[in-house]
Amino acid sequence: MRRYTISDIARMADVSPATVSRVLSNSPGVNKVKRAEVKRIIEETGYHPSSAARSLVRGCSNVVGLIVRDLENQYYSAMAVCAQRRLLERGYMTMIFSIGTKAEAEEKRDYVTEISHKFDFAGLLISVPSCDYFAAEGIRNSRCPVVSLNRTFDVACDQVAQNDFQAGFLAGEYLQKLGHESFLLLAGPADESVSCRFRMEGFIQSLAVNGRELDEENAIRGELSMDSGYELGVKLLEERFPDHLPTGVFANGNSIALGFLKACGERGVRIPQDVSLITVDNPAIMDMPGINLSTISVPMEQMASEAVDVLLERIERKREKKRFVALQPELIVRGSTAPPQRRCLPDNK
């Protein structure tokens, strides 16, 4: 059985391929007679347009690449689902790349450049730490439009992100309103991303507004992972603060917060009775029983939809001016924060 192409249908109907495409998508701009003729021929031939054919008519691919750090991380997996859903609504397919851990990303080095040159994407959405030098270089060298999703890069590309300074400020402000006077910041790695740095600066500024300072030794460095959060928690509770922990803790990432929460639970430290813990971002796991973490976040659906719309505006309208969209985060209060009650921690011996 012969497989007809969109060009075959256009030739048989004596119209252009673009007209056939408009009929297929039920778009305006085709008179009734021509529309009826095209539909008749499509029905007689049994023609079904492939995604490649639709792409050729549009003059570009209808596939968007989505690069995230690690799909095992709840944040990135939730982001991927939301972005894919929005792209599908707009008529685009998604190819997702999970780069892996920090070490794996460093080993792959120029993965963004390789992906953008290997595949004929209409555009790329990228959500990896902005301290990733090779990602930044890949954005500069990309063959297609790029939008950075909730990560702030010092490169000329469209960027959609939450206001990270405001996120950190809101976290510190809320802990102080609850009455906390001693604070601990799980800050992230020394080569932290721009996003992490802005959140840290916002948190410190919220203390300064009220005449407080964060002790330098209370800004704890570590990777933004559950393992790192757990290891830091164990070390802090057993070595650094064996008798009492600062009562207000801000974790600069939800994975490190989950690890810290586990360490506290294993050592009898009650959340929020002994320590209030607040973090950033809001994947579904944050609201699960036994976790129930207060957080500062922009709704994931809003952020992903905004990023997709910005990318497709550049693809479809050929917009040249770069855009930076800063979304304002909101406080989500759950069961991990409360006014301070006491500072003494249980005897773990």
Which stretches of residues belong to each language-model region?
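N-terminal helix-turn-helix DNA-binding module of bacterial transcription factors
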Residues: 1-62, 75, 338, 348-349
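Alpha-helical recognition/docking segments in bacterial nutrient-uptake
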Residues: 1-5, 59-173, 241-244
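Residue-level detector of anion-binding/catalytic polar loops
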Residues: 48, 88-93, 145, 181, ...
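Short beta-strand segments enriched in small/hydrophobic residues
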Residues: 12, 17-22, 56-72, 82, ...
